[in-house]
Structures are given as structure tokens and as C-alpha cells.
Amino acid sequence: MNDTTATRCGYVAIVGRPNVGKSTLLNHILGQKLAITSRKPQTTRHNMLGIKTEGAVQAIYVDTPGMHKNGEKALNRYMNKTASAALKDVDVVIFVVDRTRWTDEDQMVLERVQYVQGPVILAINKTDRIEDKSDLMPHLEWLQGQLPNASIVPISAQHGHNLEALESLIASHLPENDHFFPEDQITDRSSRFLAAELVREKIMRQLGAELPYQITVEIEEFKQQGRTLHIHALILVERDGQKKIIIGDKGDRIKRIGSDARRDMELLFDSKVMLNLWVKVKGGWSDDERALRSLGYGDL
């Protein structure tokens, strides 16, 4: 970010269709893993704040679920509502799109972003993979026509290409404000929430297309005992068949999930972690508004 004598602070919404690179972008800006990622759409389910303070500038990023068309369950409605709500009361909107690909879900996000009154930045992701940059021009010109007042910044969320320019532009749009959070705080989310998300990420990465999205993780115990952090996590699925898939042959799969999650937790929490995982069937939870609220999904 640019150095400035003025103290600046504001909220920055990161929006886009599922699996376009929003969470990867947030993690790279923060310089550490905070938001979970996988190649599967709809990995992110909640708005999460990622806070970066650099000098006089504090940018508070809101990582959002990908807006999507398919899915009529209560969980899908929650995710779309959550993402749309992030466009309100923020100071800057980053609309992440692919370098060439445009889908109906991109169009759905665009139609919401067009109503935004404040600054909009189009972050064109994965542009480092294009050898001849002139191939980008037709897509960029079309996008500029859809959002005439938006700034366009080509980036690579994965490799960090051009993120310094993106952050500098964001900083220039933030209002003069005292900082809302302490300098060393990087998120508004609890350690329990982050632990649950890491377990869910490893499940999605291990299973891929084998497992539908009717899965969530609840932390039942989170306790520091001496130098070891003891975490008990409950994995909720909707059918017995899903439970068997997660556990795997002789428990091999759930052991790999636990091992991978524990490794990331130890880095995040800077502590030795003892992680225990259980799998429980709770039929229909993803379409049960009361169950969703009890699991921390808020109002639907």
C-alpha cells in the first residue's frame, strides 16, 4: 500500500462467482492462510473479515461466498444473501473475474455490482497465464463497457502478480478514519471458527466430487492444556453413505483429513495440536433453517 500521512481505514468487499479465486486473493494479500480454499465451488460459506494494517492504512477485507444460481436449499439461499449483503456499507468493492471465461454466475454478480455507488475495482485473475496480453483486450473492453466507472487491475491471486498495484489502488479509495482494529489483529473470526473451516477444507480437498456439499463441521471442544491445544471436531453429514465415505477404508481417509488439518492448525495457532474427529449423521440439516442457525449460519 502507498504510504500516506492520513490515517485511513475502511471495508473492502471481495465478490465474484464461486471458485474464481476470492479466498486465494485474500490469503495472498494477508500473507498467511486465513480463508479456506479448494478447487470445488462454494467452498466459502460465510463472510469473513481479513484485516491488513500497513502504516497509516488499515484495509478490512470481506471475503464472501461465491454467488451462484443453482441450489434452492436454505444453505444456498444463505450463501447468496450473505454475499449480496457484503455489497452494502463497504467503501470499496473488488469484483474478481476470470481472464477470459464468463458465466451466468459472473453475470449475476455483475448485475448486483452495477448498483454499487462507491468505487469498484475489476480484478482480472490468472492473467499471468496469458502469453500475448493483447488477447485480453476484447474481454477487458467488454467489461469496461459493463462497468464504465470501474478500475481494471490484472492480477494473479495465486502467484501474487500485481497485488501491490491493487492494494495501492484500494488504499487510495479508503476514507480518512481511525483504525477500527488493533494493528496485530488479522480477522474477526474466532479460533474455533477457523479450526472448523480447516477441517472442512481438508474434507473437500480429500474427497472432491465424491462428496456433495451437505457437510459442516462443529467444534465441540477447544482447550489449551499446557503446550498442547486440544480440539474435538464433529463432522455433520446427511446420510450414512456420506459418513462411510469420510471415514474411508479402515478409517484411513479420516486419518488423512485429521493429519492435514492438524498440520495447518499448528501453523495457524503456533501450538502443538491434538485433534480428534467424529462423524455424525444429521439428516436434512442443509435445508433446515433452524438447524442452520444453530450451526452458526445466521438469519436466512
Curated annotation (Swiss-Prot):
Stretches for region G4: 125-128
Superkingdom, taxonomy of origin: Bacteria
SUPFAM superfamilies, A to Z: P-loop containing nucleoside triphosphate hydrolases, Prokaryotic type KH domain (KH-domain type II)
Domain Era-type G: 8-176
Protein's name in the database: GTPase Era
Membrane topology classification: Peripheral membrane protein
Domain KH type-2: 199-283
A GO CC annotation given for this chain: plasma membrane
NCBIfam families listed in its UniProt record: era, PRK00089.1, small_GTP
UniProt entry tagged with the keyword Cell cycle: no
Cellular compartment(s): Cytoplasm; Cell inner membrane
Region: G3, residue numbers: 63-66
Chief localization: cytoplasm
Keywords attached to this entry: Cell inner membrane, Cell membrane, Cytoplasm, GTP-binding, Membrane, Nucleotide-binding, Ribosome biogenesis, RNA-binding, rRNA-binding
Role description: An essential GTPase that binds both GDP and GTP, with rapid nucleotide exchange. Plays a role in 16S rRNA processing and 30S ribosomal subunit biogenesis and possibly also in cell cycle regulation and energy metabolism.
GO BP terms in the entry: ribosomal small subunit assembly
Organism listed in the record: Pseudomonas savastanoi pv. phaseolicola (strain 1448A / Race 6)
Chain spans, region G2: 42-46
Single Gene Ontology MF annotation: GTPase activity
